[in-house]
């Protein structure tokens, strides 16, 4: 008999990393073949802007989700409950309730598995209330993390024997990256226009490159946010003297987004904080070398000096205090801008690493193996 698993996860909309992985799990034939799977959508936000907000409507929706979970546990009697919780802040407090109730409703202890698509425990663990909650939250659970670097985030509360590692994957679109022949190399930023993504440091780095006489075209693809309005972004480009070597095209999806990866020579993500961004996997799929911060699990994606460059040191950074150094960022980008052979070599290495480790097929295989192993050993 197949193990019965209740998957309590986030599904789109809105579209973000965790919800996309949730959709991959929900739609996976391998998961359905291996397990008697039932699903509850934990999402209460209607848009990206709605994430983290409160209100009576969302409270009512949350209560409905709890009723749905309780009913599924009582009627389906799953062997395991799988939950994708948030790790810090007000979203964590909500998911704390979900996880603790799941533990209570399950007849046996140790039958809840937590799959984290984010990080942040280490940033809150010194607070008295959060520390008390984390100690209860992580008791009698199994944990899946996106990569070994992220164990640092939870090691205060979880023994590594109760942790499994499952890197995300994305569908292999069969992209055959061609050598990009541009008179002026193109740098791609593909994420929301936010300060916490390292926007201002990146603009500083681009200004340095321009002052050095290095030629480039920097494309910005992503939505505007409350952090940076359209007027503020336009002003920042003007102040940095970048209007003649940058373009902002807004959000792009599907083939339109792929067109920018196809033409990019370098992909940048100098974020203050990340977990395991799927956009880096997309860049690798298209054979684009990556320059990114050493935050969260990015070092498990990018081989420093092999498939791109990491900035911020060799040790993965878990706190939210990191700020990328604009000079270091400029130097790494310049190295790739001025060395075509290095760009091509790193791009090919990234494509190979993607095919070996980060396809959706590889993710599904790892995911099913982990859940099967946990079910067998428990």
Each language-model region and where it sits:
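Conserved donor-binding/catalytic core segment of Leloir-type glycosyltransferases
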Residues: 6-7, 178-206, 218-224
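Glycosyltransferase donor-sugar binding loop
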Residues: 41-45, 190, 217-232, 250-251
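Donor nucleotide-sugar binding/catalytic pocket of nucleotide-sugar-dependent glycosyltransferases
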Residues: 135-175
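Nucleotide-activated donor-binding/catalytic signature segment of Leloir-type glycosyltransferases, i.e.
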Residues: 231-252
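Short alpha-helical donor nucleotide-sugar binding micro-motif in glycosyltransferases
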Residues: 251-252, 259-264
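Short hydrophobic beta-strand element within catalytic cores of glycosyltransferases
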Residues: 289-292, 302
